[in-house]
Design a protein with these regions (language model features):
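The serine-hydrolase catalytic nucleophile loop
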Residues: 63-72, 87, 203
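Short beta-strand element of the alpha/beta-hydrolase
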Residues: 51-60
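Conserved alpha/beta-hydrolase
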Residues: 76-92
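Short beta-strand/loop motif that positions the catalytic acidic residue
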Residues: 185, 191-193, 197
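Alpha/beta-hydrolase active-site loop
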Residues: 67, 98-119
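C-terminal catalytic histidine-bearing segment of alpha/beta-hydrolase fold enzymes
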Residues: 216-259
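Primarily recognizes the serine-hydrolase "nucleophile elbow" in alpha/beta-hydrolase
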Residues: 110-184
Length: 259
């Protein structure tokens, strides 16, 4: 098994099965240094020379899923280096929950350091895309890491305190609302939310957008009539038109800010 050893991480190109060569994209299993040591992730690199913008693609509360890998692969086919870190499998979380957990935030910092030092990436053209739990993380990462240029939040919670959900407690209830972190954000932010979201109401997206614009930050908000949570992935809640539009807007947004 071939290895490339860098100062921050080890990149392991798959030998069984072989690296995927689909639509001009190379795929690899990788490890990077996270909060508690080596963390697994998948890396997608478009073919062609030159340094490219890099995008972290963050999974939801269910952890890494094939649909997230597919999204990252498709984004790489558009010309971006993409990385999908597994933020859950190697940690044991207490019953108070995972929201804004220091271990996860440390893993995110490690993932950013990893993509910045890859020879295929431009170290100052870094973006983050996240879904639900990962959508909140994308914006939080932008607040904690000013080098991030673009953050895309798909239907993530802006403020657990504003949800009014009796089941919300523990770390989530004590978390700092994203609306109180906007002053630290330098990145442009794209918020995409279904208007029929039964898991995290669209008001959460609007709340964040208002806070960003009032703080003089760059924010775009798109809401999709009839679209529920996770509208852009296959399943009972899939909304074809919202999925198509949100994808096109994500790609255009990242091209604007990372190229």
């Amino acid at each position: 098994m071939g290895r490339w050893v860098g100062a921050l991480s080890v990149l392991v190109w798959l030998s069984c099965p072989a690296p995927v060569e689909a639509a001009g994209v190379r795929e690899a299993a990788v490890e990077y240094t996270g909060s508690e040591g080596a963390m697994p992730a998948r890396l997608y690199i478009p073919e062609g020379g030159g340094r490219r913008g890099a995008v972290l693609v963050l999974h939801g509360i269910d952890g890494p899923q094939p649909v997230i890998e597919g999204f990252a692969r498709d984004l790489a086919a558009e010309g971006f280096v993409t990385l999908t870190p597994d933020l859950f499998s190697l940690h044991e979380f207490a019953s108070e929950g995972r929201v804004d957990h220091p271990l996860i935030l440390g893993d995110l910092a490690g993932a950013l350091a990893f993509v910045k030092q890859l020879p295929e990436t431009h170290p100052v053209r870094i973006g983050v895309v996240g879904f639900s739990f990962g959508g909140r993380l994308a914006v939080l990462a932008a607040a904690l890491h000013p080098e991030i240029r673009a953050a895309v939040n798909y239907y993530g919670v802006a403020s657990y305190q504003e949800l009014g959900n009796r089941e919300v407690g523990g770390r989530a209830l004590r978390s700092v609302p994203l609306t109180e972190r906007v002053s630290a954000i330098r990145a442009a932010v794209l918020i995409q939310h279904g208007e029929a979201d039964q898991t995290n109401p669209v008001e959460q997206g609007r709340l964040l957008h208002v806070a960003l614009t009032r703080a003089g930050k760059r924010s775009l908000l798109y809401t999709y009539p009839g679209a529920d949570h996770v509208f852009n992935f296959a399943g009972s809640r899939h909304h074809a038109e919202a999925a198509r539009l949100s994808w096109e807007r994500t790609v255009a947004f990242l091209r604007e800010h990372l190229r």
